[in-house]
């Protein structure tokens, strides 16, 4: 059990870039929807 707790920072460091990107995902989907509407012609 203690070894698992000791290894947590290593595991977390792998996912740290992913956690940095997470807040930008809704913005990305908003831009994707905007580009899709622009390509359709704002029907």
Swiss-Prot record:
Presence of keyword Cell membrane: no
Domain of life: Eukaryota
One Gene Ontology cellular component annotation held by this UniProt entry: chloroplast thylakoid membrane
Pfam families: PsbK
Chloroplast among keywords: yes
Primary location: plastid
Propeptide segment residues: 1-6
GO biological process: photosynthesis
Segments crossing the lipid bilayer: 14-34
Sequence similarity: Belongs to the PsbK family.
HAMAP family tied to this protein: PSII_PsbK
Oligomeric and partner information: PSII is composed of 1 copy each of membrane proteins PsbA, PsbB, PsbC, PsbD, PsbE, PsbF, PsbH, PsbI, PsbJ, PsbK, PsbL, PsbM, PsbT, PsbY, PsbZ, Psb30/Ycf12, at least 3 peripheral proteins of the oxygen-evolving complex and a large number of cofactors. It forms dimeric complexes.
PANTHER family, A to Z: PHOTOSYSTEM II REACTION CENTER PROTEIN K, PTHR35325
Function as written in the Swiss-Prot or TrEMBL entry: One of the components of the core complex of photosystem II (PSII). PSII is a light-driven water:plastoquinone oxidoreductase that uses light energy to abstract electrons from H(2)O, generating O(2) and a proton gradient subsequently used for ATP formation. It consists of a core antenna complex that captures photons, and an electron transfer chain that converts photonic excitation into a charge separation.
The protein's name: Photosystem II reaction center protein K
């Amino acid at each position: 059990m203690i070894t698992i707790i000791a290894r947590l920072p290593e595991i977390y460091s792998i996912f740290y870039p992913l956690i940095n990107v997470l807040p930008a995902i809704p913005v990305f989907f908003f831009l994707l929807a905007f580009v899709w509407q622009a390509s359709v012609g704002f029907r």
